[in-house]
Structure formats: C-alpha cells, structure tokens
Amino acid sequence: MATRTQARGAVVELLYAFESGNEEIKKIASSMLEEKKIKNNQLAFALSLFNGVLEKINEIDALIEPHLKDWDFKRLGSMEKAILRLGAYEIGFTPTQNPIIINECIELGKLYAEPNTPKFLNAILDSLSKKLAQKPLN
C-alpha cells in the first residue's frame, strides 16, 4: 500500500506533466496513479490534491509569487513549480500541519529536482506558511 509521501510524489509527477503541456493528464490521472500502486484512501488523497491544485492554480501562483524575492515565477523549472504548487495548495487549503507539508516538499525536491532546490523550496514555503498564519485564506 502506498504512503502519503508516495501519493504526493505521484501528484508532483502529474503536475509536472500538466505544466509541461500535457492537458490530457487530467483525464488519465486516476489510472496513472493506480499504475503507481496508489490505491484506495491514498488514491482519493492524491486525486484531491491534484484536482485541488488545478482548480486553484491561479490563486496558488499568486500566493507563491510574492515569496520568490529575486525570482520570476515564469522562469522557474516545471518540477519546482509542481512542488511549490502542491505545497502552497496544502498549506493554504488543507488541514495538514505546515511543518509536515514543508518537509514532504523538501523531500520531493531532493528526489526530483536540482541539488539546491530543497533549500529554495523550504525558504518559499516557510515564508508562505508564516504569511498565511497571520492572515488565513478562509
């Protein structure tokens, strides 16, 4: 049985495919997750994250951008965008504790991105979580 960490990793892969121009990924997300042995509760969890990010993608991007400092969101790599979007969605729109979300995103960065990406993800998501703690979205 898959873990939430594995489910998040699969969601990042789906978001990466979407960011890379594969809009058909929305139609086959469920079967792709099942191929990765993401089933039952974890399948529902992964699909809720994937669909949640896509439904709120513009709002999520607007949440992330002010925390980039010297970076332009459009110039970020597709994998970095995928991980940041997942993290920002979970921080802003789910009850999962922020330290858990940030740690999971750091681990995903180590697995999928460039060596300096985990520090970058940590800085952005930590800044975002502190901002939302002061002024929640709901």
UniProtKB/Swiss-Prot annotation:
It comes from the Bacteria. GO terms for cellular component: cytosol. It holds the Pfam family NusB. Keywords: RNA-binding, Transcription, Transcription antitermination, Transcription regulation. Gene3D superfamilies: NusB-like. The keyword RNA-binding applies. Coiled coil: none annotated. SUPFAM superfamilies: NusB-like. GO terms for molecular function: RNA binding. InterPro entries: NusB-like_sf, NusB_fam, NusB_RsmB_TIM44. One of its GO terms (biological process) is transcription antitermination. The keyword Transcription applies. Belongs to the NusB family. Involved in transcription antitermination. Required for transcription of ribosomal RNA (rRNA) genes. Binds specifically to the boxA antiterminator sequence of the ribosomal RNA (rrn) operons. This is Transcription antitermination protein NusB. It comes from Helicobacter pylori (strain Shi470). The gene is nusB.
